[in-house]
C-alpha cells in the first residue's frame, strides 16, 4: 500500500483527508502547525493527536523528503542543493541572498521537454513531473538550513528545472501552500511562476492562482523565438501576449508581468531587436529583465557584453519600458540562470530514438 505523503495536500485536501478518517476539520490546522511551524514530521510526536489517530496516520500516511546529495556554496554566497528523488532522478534548487530579501529558485520537473536552445536544463530532455510534496519539500529543506544560519526565504520563484505550466496541478497546489498562512504565508507578489509560454495554461493560471507571472520571451519576433524557444512554434508571440492580457485583467488586485530576455551575442541583442521589443511590449503592463547569458558545456552561444546590454536597456527605457539587468549569481557552482542541469535520465530522447 502506497502511503499518502501529506506534503502533497493543500488545506482543502487535508480537510478531505481527515474527514475520510472520521476526524473534524480542526485536525487540518493541527497537522499544518506541526509540519510548517514546528517542523515536526514524526506522527508519534504529535501529542495533541489521539493514540489511535497517530497509529492510523503511521499506517496510511507519511511526511517524506528527497535526499540531499550535495550542497554547494558560491563565492557570492549563493547556495545550491542537489536532491535525489530516486536512483535516476535528481533536481536542483538555488538560494540567492540579497540585502533586503532571500530568493529560493525551485524546480517543478526533472529535466525539461521544451528544449530552449540557450538553457542547460532544456538540453537534457525530460524525465518526470514533480509531485506537490517534492516541490514543497524543497522549501522545507532550504528553510531548515537557512533558519540555522538566521537567514530567511522571502521570495519563491519557479525558475529552476522544468516548465511549471506543464505540471499545473502539482504547482498550483504548491502555490496554495506557499500562500497559506497555516503553511508558509507568503504574499502573492513574492511567489512567481515562470513559463516559456504555454498559452492554455496561462489562461487557466489566471483563474486558479493569484501568484506573479514571468514570461521567458527572449526574442521580439516569431522567426527568432521559434529557434530559441521551440514552443513558440505552437503558441506564437501574438497568442502569448493575448493570454498575458487575460492574466493581467483576471485578478481583483493589480497584476504585473516580468518578461525575461537572455542576452545572446549577435543573436537577439541588436538595436533593432531592442526597438522591436519596446514596440511589442508598449501596450502591456510589463517589466523586462535582461539576463546575461550563462555559459554551459557544448553551448553555441556567448553572452552579450556589458556595453551592449546597457545600450539595449537604454533603448527600452527611452520608450517607456521598465527594465532591469539581472546580475549573474552563483556561476561558479553552475547555479546561475540556465545552468540547472541536474542528473537527468533523458527519456524523451530515448522514446524518440525508438520511434525512428
Swiss-Prot record:
Methyltransferase as a keyword of this entry, yes or no, is yes
> Keywords assigned by UniProt?
4Fe-4S, Cytoplasm, Disulfide bond, Iron, Iron-sulfur, Metal-binding, Methyltransferase, rRNA processing, S-adenosyl-L-methionine, Transferase, tRNA processing
Q: What coarse category fits the chief subcellular location reported for this protein? A: cytoplasm
Q: Which reaction does it catalyse?
A: adenosine(2503) in 23S rRNA + 2 reduced [2Fe-2S]-[ferredoxin] + 2 S-adenosyl-L-methionine = 2-methyladenosine(2503) in 23S rRNA + 5'-deoxyadenosine + L-methionine + 2 oxidized [2Fe-2S]-[ferredoxin] + S-adenosyl-L-homocysteine; adenosine(37) in tRNA + 2 reduced [2Fe-2S]-[ferredoxin] + 2 S-adenosyl-L-methionine = 2-methyladenosine(37) in tRNA + 5'-deoxyadenosine + L-methionine + 2 oxidized [2Fe-2S]-[ferredoxin] + S-adenosyl-L-homocysteine
Residues of the active site: 92, 337
**Among the entry's GO cellular component annotations, what is one?**
cytoplasm
Q: Give compartment(s).
A: Cytoplasm
InterPro entries per UniProt? Aldolase_TIM (IPR013785), Methyltransferase_A (IPR040072), RlmN_N (IPR048641), RNA_MTrfase_RlmN (IPR027492), rRNA_lsu_MTrfase_RlmN/Cfr (IPR004383), rSAM (IPR007197)
The disulfides recorded in the entry are 105-337
The record places domain Radical SAM core at 98-334
What's the record's note on cofactor binding? Binds 1 [4Fe-4S] cluster. The cluster is coordinated with 3 cysteines and an exchangeable S-adenosyl-L-methionine.
Q: Where does [4Fe-4S] cluster bind?
A: 112, 116, 119
Its needed co-factors are: [4Fe-4S] cluster
Q: What is its EC number?
A: 2.1.1.192
The record's Gene Ontology biological-process terms are: rRNA base methylation; tRNA methylation
Q: What GO MF terms are annotated?
A: 4 iron, 4 sulfur cluster binding; metal ion binding; rRNA (adenine(2503)-C2-)-methyltransferase activity; rRNA binding; tRNA (adenine(37)-C2)-methyltransferase activity; tRNA binding
Q: Which domain of life is it from?
A: Bacteria
Q: What does this protein do?
A: Specifically methylates position 2 of adenine 2503 in 23S rRNA and position 2 of adenine 37 in tRNAs. m2A2503 modification seems to play a crucial role in the proofreading step occurring at the peptidyl transferase center and thus would serve to optimize ribosomal fidelity.
Q: Which family does it belong to?
A: Belongs to the radical SAM superfamily. RlmN family.
The entry's other comment says: Reaction proceeds by a ping-pong mechanism involving intermediate methylation of a conserved cysteine residue.
- Its recorded name reads Dual-specificity RNA methyltransferase RlmN
Instruction: Identify the taxonomic lineage of the organism of origin.
Output: Bacteria, Pseudomonadati, Pseudomonadota, Gammaproteobacteria, Candidatus Pseudothioglobaceae
Amino acid at each position: 500500500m502506497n502511503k499518502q505523503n501529506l506534503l502533497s495536500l493543500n488545506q482543502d485536501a487535508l480537510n478531505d483527508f481527515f474527514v475520510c478518517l472520521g476526524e473534524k476539520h480542526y485536525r487540518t490546522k493541527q497537522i499544518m502547525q506541526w509540519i510548517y511551524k514546528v517542523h515536526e514530521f514524526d506522527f508519534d510526536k504529535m501529542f495533541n493527536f489521539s493514540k489511535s489517530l497517530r497509529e492510523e496516520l503511521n499506517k496510511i500516511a507519511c511526511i517524506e523528503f528527497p535526499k540531499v546529495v550535495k550542497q554547494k556554496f558560491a563565492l557570492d554566497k549563493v547556495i545550491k542543493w542537489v536532491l535525489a528523488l530516486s536512483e535516476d532522478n535528481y533536481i536542483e534548487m538555488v538560494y540567492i541572498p540579497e540585502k533586503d530579501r532571500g530568493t529560493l529558485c525551485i524546480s517543478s520537473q526533472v529535466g525539461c521537454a521544451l528544449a530552449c536552445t540557450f538553457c542547460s536544463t532544456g538540453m537534457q530532455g525530460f524525465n518526470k513531473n514533480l509531485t506537490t510534496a517534492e516541490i514543497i519539500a524543497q522549501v522545507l529543506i532550504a528553510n531548515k538550513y537557512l533558519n540555522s544560519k538566521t537567514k530567511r526565504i522571502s521570495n519563491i520563484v519557479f525558475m529552476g528545472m522544468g516548465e511549471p505550466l506543464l505540471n499545473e496541478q502539482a504547482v498550483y497546489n504548491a502555490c496554495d501552500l506557499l500562500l497559506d498562512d497555516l503553511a508558509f504565508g507568503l504574499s502573492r507578489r513574492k511567489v512567481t511562476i515562470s513559463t516559456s509560454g504555454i498559452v492554455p495554461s496561462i489562461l487557466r493560471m489566471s483563474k486558479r492562482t493569484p501568484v506573479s507571472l514571468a514570461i521567458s520571451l527572449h526574442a521580439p519576433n516569431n522567426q527568432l523565438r521559434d529557434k530559441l524557444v521551440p514552443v513558440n512554434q505552437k503558441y506564437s508571440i501574438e497568442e502569448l501576449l493575448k493570454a498575458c492580457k487575460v492574466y493581467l485583467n483576471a485578478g481583483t488586485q493589480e497584476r504585473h508581468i516580468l518578461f525575461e530576455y537572455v542576452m545572446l551575442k549577435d543573436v537577439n541583442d541588436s538595436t533593432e531587436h531592442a526597438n522591436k521589443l519596446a514596440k511589442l511590449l508598449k501596450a502591456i503592463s510589463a517589466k523586462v529583465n535582461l539576463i546575461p547569458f550563462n555559459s554551459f558545456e557544448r553551448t553555441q552561444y556567448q553572452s552579450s557584453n556589458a556595453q551592449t546590454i546597457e545600450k539595449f536597456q537604454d533603448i527600452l527605457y527611452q520608450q517607456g519600458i521598465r527594465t532591469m539587468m539581472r546580475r549573474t549569481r552563483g556561476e561558479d557552482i553552475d547555479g546561475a540562470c540556465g545552468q540547472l542541469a541536474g542528473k537527468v535520465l533523458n527519456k524523451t530522447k530515448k522514446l524518440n530514438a525508438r520511434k525512428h
